[in-house]
Amino acid sequence: MVMGNNVEMDIKKLLTPLVKMKNANISMSIKFGEEEEEEWEPMGPTPMPKIPTLRHWDFKLLERYPPFYMPICDLCCLCTFGKCDLSRGKKGACGLNIKAQQARIVLIACCIGAACHAGHSRHLVHHLIETLGRDYPIDLGNEIEVEAPIARTVTGIKPKTLGDLEKILDYCEEQITHLLSAAHTGQEGDYLDFESKALHAGMIDDLAREAGDLAQIVAYNMPKGDEDAPLIELGFGCIDKSKPVILCIGHNVVPGSYILEYLEENSMEDEVEVCGICCTAIDITRVSDKPKVVGPLSRQLMFVRSGVADVVIVDEQCIRTDILEEVLKTGAVLIATNEKMCLGLEDVSHMDEDEIIGYLLRNRAALLLDEKKVGKVAVEVAKIVAKERKDRKTLPDLNEVVELAKQCTECGWCNRNCPNAFKVKEAMALAKQGNFKGFIDLYKRCYGCGRCEAICPRNLPIVSMTTKVGEAYYKDLKFKMRAGRGPIKDVEIRSVGAPIVFGDIPGVVALVGCSNHPNGEEEVAMIAKEFLERKYIVVATGCAAMAIGMWKDKDGKTLYEKYPGEFRAGGLVNCGSCLSNCHITGAAIKIANIFAKVPLRGNYAEVADYILNKVGAVGVAWGAMSQKAAAIATGVNRWGIPVILGPHGAKYRRLYLSNGEKFKVKDKKTGEILEIEPAPEHLIVTAENVKECICMIPKLCMRPNDTPKGRANKIYHYVDVYEKYFGRMPPDLEKFVRTEKDIPFMMKDKIMAYLEEKGWKPLEKYPQDPTILY
């Protein structure tokens, strides 16, 4: 029997001679192996949307939040007509102008990001179907009935098995193909249609991530919305160097899971140290609480250079492309485990495990695509290599740091090439005198990109020098991070739905993204701390979730130890890895469905319209750097959720900014078209520094649906943070005070005095049930 095949035939061939039918020529189609889709909810208008299907919704958003372009290059070099200069109104040989070219590059970035997550999810689902079967159930327990809110809304599919996730990924891959084809020379020519396609790519990215995370949650028995998920050890200082150390870098949990399985089966969990960097670190700690998290990707080069790891396992995404060179310098062994990162290595997958171990001990690196073999190979190699490297020195000692610093000519190229313009030259000048104050400061804030080294005319190992000083002076690099809990439970949504929609909970702040921070990880923790204290709900994923854990209060406690892991006011929720960003969007969708009874199935625009107008949530990608982050942010934007980027986010080339004037909405209760406050004011915007970011958050959590009490709550926080960080009232406060009822009682006198100075007038009317779908 072949699944999904159609059989067509002439029914006359089936008739016996006893049956007389004149001109009977009937075609019939018989479907094998596919069950009828369960009618769990009436199908909405847009299941499996194609590129143009939601274009009307995109254009509604783009009319209110037109793209603002910041070209970092005026040239187009994508075809052999070029390179074409698009500055000063010029067109390229194909006819594109600079606006369309910038939008095209944004689309390409979003397609790369979406393809990355779709490829990751496809690998997971394919591997898990191979090992567990296509009928393996998707069961998140009794407390989660809406298990796949994005899939339900976008595709109309309610996935019940791993096999159902294949259908979702088939759709994702089809859409990515069409989207990427639109970026070819001589295809799309309008910047707004490029943006609509970028928004579509972002939505596909969101959907692909949900498929991948659902698969790994059910297959590896990861936490299923557990607010009391275990606290995991985090930081350089928690790694036990007396044991063989295996370091996993990347995003794919499969190789790491086999290492943990081999250790458990052979009762060696306490003999070998397993740790991780980036999202693989988060996901292996969702499988078991034994592994440890070194930190976000900003700590990758420093930790590898430290020489602690005996075996380095790389899978996919956000891995330094020179990782092989860096690992071999330390005498460690590298195993590449994913087809997306082969690093020019010999494929040893066909060998048996003992042969592979021998090969690695001789050659120090190999490509091993059979993940089932990674467990034994990594552990046994680590045990041997750890003995070989026991006394190996990989970093200069402090005296050598001084001698190296003396070679510095203080030319200043390091400062100029640093993405954050850190004072590397000044740290060198102090180190010449044996004063490491500059390097101590650098260690806390440095991203570890290595650009200072790349441009140094004396070839000084600046990152290694910084790492050594950090190791010597920071003895307590031990933190705690709550393991990624996955989705938000339905009962939590029922508890917070009304307070969020009406504004009594002032907002949901989602801290996500990479670690290209302008000033170190602590700024992410400071943002989280500020809004936890103000009883916002704070959710986190990926590198941001790790960064939040890398700060302690005066009592030595991290934010994860101080605040509960529940999705409630004052709760700090670590959803998990990059894939787990889907649960943040999913929570907003579930508010629309569980609280407001908005149907999900194939009903994207209505759900997104509800979120835009009623769910006070904002994403903060303070260290966003990758194409994946671009796709994540753009996907969130299509749902109607605003995003704040760090200062490096301007390099994505495009923001969605309103003009700050009044918006128009329709009140569904009266049918009137009303002019209202600009809420939320922008859809994606950058902040120059952390103070500016903190002050943007309360403003971007405002929604037209806020009750007077809820809006007063949000205005209180907006005014309070502005006075705290800038010592004055917000310069645009008058835009967001609709009537006197919106003014918090304890601030009424000073706010009224300010409004009188501004010539403020109350809105005559504001909507009870706002929508932009008219």
Curated annotation (Swiss-Prot):
It is an enzyme of class 1 (oxidoreductase). Gene3D superfamilies: 3.30.70.20, 3.40.50.2030, Carbon monoxide dehydrogenase alpha subunit. Chain M, domain 1. [Ni-4Fe-4S] cluster binds at residues 251, 279, 318, 514, 543, 578. Keywords: 4Fe-4S, Iron, Iron-sulfur, Metal-binding, Nickel, Oxidoreductase, Repeat. It catalyses: CO + 2 oxidized [2Fe-2S]-[ferredoxin] + H2O = 2 reduced [2Fe-2S]-[ferredoxin] + CO2 + 2 H(+). It comes from the Archaea. [4Fe-4S] cluster 2 binds at residues 76, 79, 84, 94. Its cofactor is [4Fe-4S] cluster; [Ni-4Fe-4S] cluster. GO terms for molecular function: 4 iron, 4 sulfur cluster binding; anaerobic carbon-monoxide dehydrogenase activity; hydroxylamine reductase activity; iron ion binding; nickel cation binding; peroxidase activity. [4Fe-4S] cluster 1 binds at residues 73, 77. Its EC number is 1.2.7.4. CO binds at residue 117. InterPro entries: 4Fe4S_Fe-S-bd, 4Fe4S_Fe_S_CS, CdhA, HCP/CODH, Prismane-like_a/b-sand, Prismane-like_sf. GO terms for biological process: acetyl-CoA metabolic process; nitric oxide catabolic process; response to hydrogen peroxide. [4Fe-4S] cluster 4 binds at residues 418, 446, 449, 452. Binds 7 [4Fe-4S] clusters per heterotetramer. Binds 2 [Ni-4Fe-4S] clusters per heterotetramer. [4Fe-4S] cluster 3 binds at residues 408, 411, 414, 456. Residues 398-427, 436-466 form the 4Fe-4S ferredoxin-type domain. Part of the ACDS complex that catalyzes the reversible cleavage of acetyl-CoA, allowing autotrophic growth from CO(2). The alpha-epsilon subcomponent functions as a carbon monoxide dehydrogenase. Heterotetramer of two alpha and two epsilon subunits. The ACDS complex is made up of alpha, epsilon, beta, gamma and delta subunits with a probable stoichiometry of (alpha(2)epsilon(2))(4)-beta(8)-(gamma(1)delta(1))(8). NCBIfam families: cdhA (TIGR00314). Belongs to the Ni-containing carbon monoxide dehydrogenase family. Cluster B is an all-cysteinyl-liganded 4Fe-4S cluster; cluster C is a mixed Ni-Fe-S cluster which is the active site of CO oxidation. Cluster D is also an all-cysteinyl-liganded 4Fe-4S cluster that bridges the two subunits of the CODH dimer. Contains two additional 4Fe-4S clusters, dubbed E and F, that probably transport electrons from ferredoxin to the B cluster. This is Acetyl-CoA decarbonylase/synthase complex subunit alpha.
